[in-house]
């Protein structure tokens, strides 16, 4: 039986001399992965340099909006935002906490990055709804009962709170049970429930105890409100009573189902 010819042996040698197809394919995939990984590393490094190392994305300006009593300069100083630092490195939560701590007049603040070079501080200030006299000045109280600022002059249209209860006598029980802060919050609660027309005329809110809150209006009339409970019902009763007896000088809605008036 004849063996393979010289040509046939040569063909077989050529076929077996190259790498196996599967091995060649695996090598190409490995090279592609290495190249891809290198590109990703370069891309990540470039992004990191752009954000932290370059001068293109650094903080250059701090804008302030929403101020009323505060000035933009007050807010910028309290914020202490590091101008010149990489914008991405600014800790917006820390800036917000710093502003709220240093400026109690601020109720809320939004700190936002304004690419490529800015930080925006959007401020909402607290609004006083009551004033508490203190050593010739006035402490402003907001609608949450927070005492947030002291001013030398009373803001126009904001009633003064008078805590007429004493720590002894008839008001002592309220002080022991509720404390001053709770009584202040009850006064704020009453102020929030007042009919708009009455709220505009209110000059003084007197708190004798938890259930003895009264109002003095600018025209000399007075209102016995009682506690801060049932505020909406009391507001409706007061509105109706003032319309029914416009000449009265004193109104009592402490029991809203049985309002009363007196004086003329």
Curated annotation (Swiss-Prot):
Q: What is the stated purpose of this protein?
A: Essential cell division protein.
Show the PANTHER family listed in the entry: CELL DIVISION PROTEIN DIVIB (PTHR37820), CELL DIVISION PROTEIN FTSQ (PTHR37820:SF1)
Q: Where is this region: Disordered?
A: 1-24
- Where is this gene product found? Cell membrane
- Gene Ontology biological process: cell septum assembly; FtsZ-dependent cytokinesis
Q: Output this protein's name.
A: Cell division protein FtsQ
Organism per entry: Streptomyces collinus
Q: Which family does it belong to?
A: Belongs to the FtsQ/DivIB family. FtsQ subfamily.
Q: Which domain of life is it from?
A: Bacteria
Recorded GO CC terms:
cell division site; plasma membrane
Principal location listed in the UniProt entry: membrane
Disulfide bond annotation, renumbered to this chain: none
Q: Which InterPro entries match?
A: FtsQ (IPR026579), FtsQ_DivIB (IPR050487), POTRA (IPR034746), POTRA_FtsQ_type (IPR013685)
Which terms are listed as keywords in the entry?
A: Cell cycle, Cell division, Cell membrane, Membrane, Transmembrane, Transmembrane helix
